[in-house]
UniProtKB/Swiss-Prot annotation:
Keywords: Chromatin regulator, Chromosome, Methyltransferase, Nucleus, S-adenosyl-L-methionine, Transferase
Taxonomy of the source species: Eukaryota, Fungi, Dikarya, Ascomycota, Pezizomycotina
Phosphoprotein is among the record's keywords: no
EC number annotated for this UniProt entry: 2.1.1.354
Protein name from the UniProt record: Histone-lysine N-methyltransferase, H3 lysine-4 specific
Chain residue ranges for the region called Disordered: 1-99, 119-183, 382-447, 722-797
GO biological process: methylation
Species name: Coccidioides immitis (strain RS)
Record-linked InterPro entries: COMPASS_Set1_N-SET, Nucleotide-bd_a/b_plait_sf, Post-SET_dom, RBD_domain_sf, Set1-like, Set1_fungi, SET_assoc, SET_dom
Biased composition regions of type Basic and acidic residues, renumbered to the chain: 383-395, 402-411, 737-746
Annotated binding of S-adenosyl-L-methionine, by residue: Y1245
Subcellular location: Nucleus; Chromosome
Catalysis: reaction(s): L-lysyl(4)-[histone H3] + 3 S-adenosyl-L-methionine = N(6),N(6),N(6)-trimethyl-L-lysyl(4)-[histone H3] + 3 S-adenosyl-L-homocysteine + 3 H(+); N(6)-methyl-L-lysyl(4)-[histone H3] + S-adenosyl-L-methionine = N(6),N(6)-dimethyl-L-lysyl(4)-[histone H3] + S-adenosyl-L-homocysteine + H(+); N(6),N(6)-dimethyl-L-lysyl(4)-[histone H3] + S-adenosyl-L-methionine = N(6),N(6),N(6)-trimethyl-L-lysyl(4)-[histone H3] + S-adenosyl-L-homocysteine + H(+)
Subunit structure: Component of the Set1C/COMPASS complex.
Major localisation: nucleus
Amino acid sequence: MSRAPAGFADFFPTAPSVLQKKRSKAAQDRHAANTPKAADPLPNLGLSSTPDIKGGVGTSADNPVRAVGERSAETTLALGDTNGATSSSSLSTGSSGFFSASAPPGVAKPNGISSCALTPLTNTDSSPPCKIESPLGSKSGSTDAAPQLAPTCEAHGGPEPVTITPLHTPPTPRVQARPANSEVKGHKITYDPDLDRKFPSKARRRKPQYETFGVDDEKDPPPCDPRMAIANYTRGAACKQKTKYRPTPYILRPWAYDPTTSVGPGPPTQIVVTGFDPLTPIAAISALFSSFGDIGEINNRTDPMTGRFLGVCSIKYKDSRAFRGGISLSASQAVRRAYLECKKEQRIGTRRIRVELDRNGVVSGRMVAKLITAQKAEFPSLEESRKESVGDNDNRLPIGDGAKKDNEQSKDNLPPSTAPKGPSGRSSLHPSLLAPDGPRAVLKSPVPSRIEETPILQQIKRDPYIFIAHCYVPVLSTTVPHLERRLKLYDWKAVRCDKTGYYIIFENSRRGELEAERCYRMCHMTALFTYVMNMECQPYGNPNYERSPSPERIKAEKREKAKRERLHREMELDIEEEKRLRVENLDPAREALSVLIIELRDKLLDDVKSRVAAPALYDFLEPDRHNAKRQQLGIPAPEGTGRPSFRIDASTDGTVVHSQPDAYSRHHRPGGVSSLNVLALPRIRKVKGFEQGNAVYIDERRRAKPRKREFRPLYHRLQQLHEIEDSDDDQQVSFARDTEEVESRPLSRLSSESAESDNEDDLMRKSPSLLDAKPLDVPLPESESLAGGIEQSGLPDREKSIIEELERGINTLPTSSKKRKRLIEELATRKKRKEVDNLFELDAKPLESLVEETAQEALPADSTDALRTVTPVLKDKKRKVKGQSGKQIFEERQAPKRKEIDSTQPLLFEESVELLPEGEIEISEPAIEELKPEVEWGVSTDEPRPTAEDDDTIVLDLDGWQSLIKDDEDINFLKKALSEHLAADIGNLAAWTWKHKEIKAINRGGDRGPVHSETRIDGYYVPNPSGSARTEGRKRIRESEKSKYLPHRIKVQKAREERLAKAKNDPHAAAAEAARLLAAKSLSKSTSRSTRVNNRRLIADINAQKQALPMQNGDSDVLRFNQLKKRKKPVRFARSAIHNWGLYAEENISANDMIIEYVGEKVRQQVADMRERRYLKSGIGSSYLFRIDENTVIDATKRGGIARFINHSCTPNCTAKIIKVDGSKRIVIYALRDIDRDEELTYDYKFEREWDSDDRIPCLCGSAGCKGFLN
């Protein structure tokens, strides 16, 4: 065992303090010896020397338990001295409980553990059977338990001598706060020799004297506090320098709640409102409580069984960054304002309301449960019927967990699990339940309210007034006296208020008008308590007031109204009479006869004009008939004797009018070129398969089945990309049959096949007219010259009209229509053919006129000069035709040799014409084949010239190199020059060359072959002053420069320029185009049947909302906004010609319709300014900041919808409005006018005008009313 370390007394045994402790300890020992009864009760117990099972005691020598008891008594005594006078009582109690056990202390349990183990936490209840009680047990079971425990212990084998060893520590004595009166509480010293100054220090050997106290507690009253004897001690009079005595703790001011550092629930953000009429609409409650802060959630509680309103409303507020004036308001502050304001007799309707704080919804839940319980007690029949239904369900269902759960729910006033989720609309259990009145309020004398129910604005006529809206200063009866005192410096007549706001009314005179204006100037936007008085001054009274008309005017209006009604009635009677006569005289045969007569008359007139009148006029105007008269008058003869061409157009503007093809007509083509010649019979071509193709109009089921596409490898498809072998018309079958809709009609061949056949006839007719040319002294046949002249003159106009008709059809059809796709392909084919014709200059000048002019120039000269004149012209003409045959190339090579041949003039002409034999002109696009450059070896006869002339201006691209290398010698030289360079891996050579040539053709607008200029866009490649763009730094490109090279802007700019030029040159065509656009706008905007059904349901839903909601200011905008959320207008964004991206309509939109909401992140003005600077620094040039009011801005730059892509226009088709929905402001885009499909949406940004500014933003809208700048 380890010894305790030596202390101070061991080293200094003669120290005064050590001696004093020894004397004190000796005095305590003597005092303990003098009082044995109170200190040690163990000697008073009679203990036998031998162990006795019945007695349960033994001597100290034979029984070791006694020794343990004595040691524990001594330890307890020592503790009792330390704690006061409580040790003797505790010791006596513990000893009596310990020694009163009936079992002998030495009895051990069968498991070898003694039952007398002393544990500090053992009590009577926790002791196991056959175990004596704890030494700290109660006295109640001390003697009665002995007879019961003795047999049990005997059953285990009788007494056995065991050694009892205490476990760990002895039991802790139980210290009493109030010991018995007979116990000594303590000792106090009455004489201390160390403090006696009468005796010298050497004589101070007397012993200290002690006196006990606590024995007679009744005789000795408790001593009083000596500090209370001092006057005003509790107020700090005892010591001025020390702190004031405070018997109670300080009442500190509570700390403000901080969610980051505070612990526990925060301040309440929810209130519960009662006392109003249960039938009050929720809009009225929201209008009142939204004046205290932004409402996050509002719930008008209902009965879950019947669905009726209970008159209890829970309102939860949310934090607002800028609430009515820019101040930030938290949800707890809003709740506090609402709670304090509604204590002052607030009313909703005619009832006073009561507001209570509801932190977690407990208060509202308790109120709802109380009201539901009251209703059950008031209508027991309804509850019994519900219980019966529930009981039937319980009988049908097995009893289990579900039934227990239903019982628990019924105990908690909740509906059962089998109950419906909401009230049924067809239930007959709807008794007339009385509305709860809410919590009882303190009855006070009713104060007359100064808030008028009748709108004040309707009562004001010409009196000057100032209006303060309720959204700036809440309407309260108590605010009116404060407002009157606030405006006491001004001479007003009355201050009135209604639910819209406050009206300060002045007298109706000039002085009143001036006083109203002065009050407005001095008090506008000033403070009234914590609100801002945003005033609206009307010095001339109600602007909407109209004086009642005079009696004479009323009489005149009545006479006019009666006259209009009379005329309307007479018109209706006439219409009814006409209908009746039509029904009586209805005869289909007579009606058909009248229609037939009209058509025959028109046809007869047309035949007379074309077959009788026109030939007669031309015969009369024949030049040969007037030779004598011309000679008599001295008029020279006309130059040509041939009959001039004659043309009859169906329309005066040059357009071709197409009609719907007749299903029973046998003429596949309309009146073509031959019908325009009055002297020629109509030529009807027999088309192969015409009967089968025309039968489709009669019955679409006779259409031939489309053949399947042949599968080809990718390489062959790449080579045959431009070969049109499979038509889309063969693959498409109409889904709508036997209808008159545009979608159900097959593609009309009036504008395609007829025009194609006409073009083919024209091209085939041009070559015979050229090949059959004869010397000029022989006149041509009249029919050939007339027909050729008509066709050549009418070809460009007819082709142009067909293209315009196709474009008009494309614009009128919807985007998803298959017919529109076919028309687009047809239009592209015709435009490509027209470009080829322009390239070959076929319609610029007829070939026969070129031959005639060449022949006329060749007549006066000799044959050699004529040959030199005619042959280069024809050769130059042939060079422009790419589809030449090998015979033509051979004739060109033989042309220099033919110069030496001497022949006559007619033979010369025929030789020159034979250069283009019949059938050798190939002007079809698929037959275009580039000629291989070759060297014509020969000897020049007139002057020396090089064998091959190289053009140095040709751009050396793929086509340029191919034109530069003409023979094998050039190939060998090129190989030697490139021998040092490694060959690049380009894969398939044919595919690589085809790809590069196609890219070049696309970039150059279809031009192929060698070119003399680089492929670039003018104005796009801007040279840098330093020679490198990297050394120039960052700079912004102007929008005007972007318009020069961006493809979509170039396209729009070209279209705009062409439109303006066309309108300037041909005003009639511009007027026709405007009429077409107007007709397109007036087209039916009908949609599919399912869409119409959905629209009808939506309208019914909106009408139901209109009936449910009260009609207040702004309700129409709210309803239309709800409609917008349910059915959004289909819009899309794409590249815009104005700026970057734009928004386009995907369907026709009517005027005043809501299109889309401008959504984004709501920020304050200061944050918006900071973000705008940050965006400019980061390179985001576009601004998507939209201001709602003075302090709030919507930022849609990074968090926004597609409405931010709407561009600016000086003549827009949309406008932006700010509406208020559920207490928050929203930005919605409206349509100003009817918007067509695929039209870009624009609105006016309304930037402030900046004068003499260098940083003005140019406007690129390109409209007729463009101002040039946005600011």
